[in-house]
Amino acid sequence: MKKISLPKIGIRPVIDGRRMGVRESLEAQTMNMAKATAALISEKLRHACGARVECVIADTCIAGMAESAACEEKFSSQNVGVTITVTPCWCYGSETIDMDPLRPKAIWGFNGTERPGAVYLAAALAAHSQKGIPAFSIYGHDVQDADDTSIPADVEEKLLRFARAGLAVASMKGKSYLSLGGVSMGIAGSIVDHNFFESWLGMKVQAVDMTELRRRIDQKIYDETELEMALAWADKHFRYGEDQNAEQYKRNETQSRAVLKESLLMAMCIRDMMQGNPKLAEKGLVEESLGYNAIAAGFQGQRHWTDQYPNGDTAEALLNSSFDWNGVREPFVVATENDSLNGVAMLMGHQLTGTAQVFADVRTYWSPDAVERVTGQPLTGRAEHGIIHLINSGSAALDGSCQQRDAQGNPTMKPHWEIEQSEADACLAATEWCPAIHEYFRGGGFSSRFLTEGGVPFTMTRVNIIKGLGPVLQIAEGWSVALPKAMHDQLDARTNSTWPTTWFAPRLTGKGPFSDVYSVMANWGANHGVLTIGHVGADFITLAAMLRIPVCMHNVEEAKIYRPSAWAAHGMDIEGQDYRACQNYGPLYKR
């Protein structure tokens, strides 16, 4: 089957169409703007899969309806999912704009004095607003000379932020969310809302009962050679941690081996269900070999599976990581407990950064007073105002141990195309695999256990659905913190020390939900959240605006907030604008 091509970014150079001197004097400058924009994007950005982003430039500058239509025909044939219109001059507004209502679009009007690029920008944006097709405005802060072909830093920042978010929109469109199972323990996020996926993300939901996973395992609908490779890899790299089970629930070596084998098979089969596997076709299993075209998935697990079969912790942890027995590769997005809304936050983070995502329970707020009472030690540094314990049953990406290093040697989580095999091995070495607690998981399993290194910038996110309002997005930028070992051990022992831990300190603003750490926890909309590496809340805000998902909570500096220009017409308070605009325009893929 032919592989689906990646979305491209279309560059639309628009120009003043008056001949006999005007257009002729602008052709080179206008096309050079387009080429510079394409070069910047191709150099700086990659798709989440690691491939370089490809730009498609219109064959000619666009002065009116005919050339605009020719450009659209070219873009339609080359899977252009995002457009950027560029110009250094006055052009004819509504005659030259991109009218596709589903495609994210921006306009860069050159800030120069020789020709009025800003005037076209304003006129074109007015047309977009009047027609109900929002567009993003890009206009440099400082005047440039007409022969200056450089892209100023502020323009570059907006071009790249727009392009990253736009590609995320285009990449999700037409894909599916694989709902493997149903509602887990009454968790609202696992009540999968088909309308949300269809109307806001342009995705389908593929609902599959967990018996399909059982069938694939029992009937050997997998690559048996790969299973042997996976087992050998686990034998080499897995370190086993403490078994906290009572003696009557502990498994012997043979039983533990069977649990490990099934856990690895679950990872293989869930992956095959998501993306397909041509090896299955070689076994005559053509239907199963196709997969479900899933860009994200969720596994119910609890309790209808886990009461008798190994839990999903090992499978989910390995799938969400940037590496496995096949080496370093793009991480998958698999939500624990089929929490589809946390899965969407994971998907957004992965599409924006190319990195693995850390799924976690937003478990406990520890105040400075409570920590000192329990441990006898004060919280200091970034933790001084309190911390949030992010911990779940072991399905977090192993990248979350932060054993990878950036160019300055700091702990981080890299996009998978930058990860060295030695860094993947270091993440594995920092992870213990602890037998699942019988009281929770009667069918057994192994939970990954690691401690995230401190001082790493993270952005925590969550999507929630509010009846009568629709989806909303929460964002909290902050840092992981390293606690003194004795303090960590005491606090960790009070919950479940066989699970992975991140101690998180959000950045406080002194206002609203970020007035203190307690308020961050109190305003969080659900029991789960996602950690994405870096302070990338501004990228999430831009992406949410494209999808018409209002942001109900964030601590991003106002200067970094970048939304379509029409948002400014929806009032003077910037967050109220977001709500009113999202309500006015409705979901991107209205149904």
Curated annotation (Swiss-Prot):
Its EC number is 5.3.1.25. Keywords: Carbohydrate metabolism, Cytoplasm, Fucose metabolism, Isomerase, Manganese, Metal-binding. Coiled coil: none annotated. Pathway: Carbohydrate degradation; L-fucose degradation; L-lactaldehyde and glycerone phosphate from L-fucose: step 1/3. GO terms for biological process: D-arabinose catabolic process; L-fucose catabolic process. SUPFAM superfamilies: FucI/AraA C-terminal domain-like, FucI/AraA N-terminal and middle domains. It is found in: Cytoplasm. InterPro entries: Fuc/Ara_isomerase_C, Fuc_iso_dom3_sf, Fuc_isomerase_C, Fucose_iso_dom1_sf, Fucose_iso_N1, Fucose_isomerase, Fucose_isomerase_dom2_sf, Fucose_isomerase_N/cen_sf. Its cofactor is Mn(2+). Homohexamer. This is L-fucose isomerase. The lineage of its organism: Bacteria, Pseudomonadati, Pseudomonadota, Gammaproteobacteria, Enterobacterales.
